[in-house]
Amino acid sequence: PITYYMYPIISNECLGMIFALPGKGKTLFALELAWRCSQGLDFMDWKFNNMIKPPPVLYVEGEMSATQVQDRVSSMVERDRGLKDFDLDNFYIAVLKEQPNESYQKLKTPEGRLNVQNSADEIYKKTGKKPIIFLDNVRFLMGNFNEKEGQDWIDFVLWLATLRAKGYSTYFLHHAVNTGEKASGSGYQDSNLDVNIKLSQPDENSATDHSSDHFTQIQFEFKKMRENVIGQMTPFIMVVDRNKGSWSKFPVLNKTERKIKSMLDSGKSAKDIINPEKEGMSKANVHKTINKLKGENDGVDKKTSNREAKEVC
């Protein structure tokens, strides 16, 4: 049976892709998700399933050094200190740059794929739990391959399907095409996914008022999910405080809708806000915004909220 670690973003036997343009938050988000899952911590509105023990994580990194990854993990440890006892042995890192001459076998080769699978099997033998595998990112870890050719993806995609059949969950990170609308490649890499996540930078009209000097904004969108849950398919904005390392969630609103939300948050009623003389404050627009905000809070699947071993946010 499928068991969710964090409903609905990650479960056992899950194959997921996170794609974005370079520098738009793939590693920042994936490391945070991996860390919190390995320690049984909630992540924004995604609640960790406290009916099960946290799974180990194997994070395979193709760009950063082990020191850079460990520095990021250390900052998360410091931030979360006091929330619960940590199990740092539940978070494993394999880094391309730490191999002699960066000679880590590429995932395009059978040897490279076997290396990762053997590492995952060793963690399973040691802990008794199958790790979640993160591959960051495909372009660097695969090596010399033509991502626009479906033929070049076949062995990799079949290997991911084999891992899933063995009970392993795998998330791989990938770059987007220049428009940012879809993952780069032939489309074959999307064919077997349970979860497909698009990350992007919010456009100027929908970005929040947080200063770009101190905060990073990432727009999150599920492009595909194993289960279509009401409210979960709605895009939202994640705001990361770079000093504190904290993550906050905001609805995607234009500037007028954000102004209406601010007035509602201050205690004003719809009747107080409606003003046909003011641009954007018509009765129709105010109620449209209220309904949009209400939809942000309706992401609970009533049918699945009582299922065993599933926490629904």
Positions of the model-derived regions?
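Amphipathic alpha-helical transducer elements in NTP-driven molecular machines
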Residues: 3, 66, 70, 110-117, ...
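Conserved catalytic network of the ASCE P-loop NTPase/AAA+ motor domain
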Residues: 49-53, 123-127, 162-166, 190-191
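Conserved inter-motif catalytic segment of the P-loop NTP-binding fold
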Residues: 51-146
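C-terminal regions of RecA-like/P-loop NTPase motor modules
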Residues: 126-129, 165, 205-313
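Phosphate-binding/switch region of NTP-binding enzymes
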Residues: 17-18, 23, 28, 151-243
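The Walker A/P-loop phosphate-binding site
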Residues: 1-78, 83
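Conserved RecA-like P-loop NTPase ATPase core
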Residues: 10, 59, 136, 193, ...
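Conserved, well-folded catalytic cores of nucleic-acid-processing
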Residues: 36-40, 76, 141-144, 163, ...
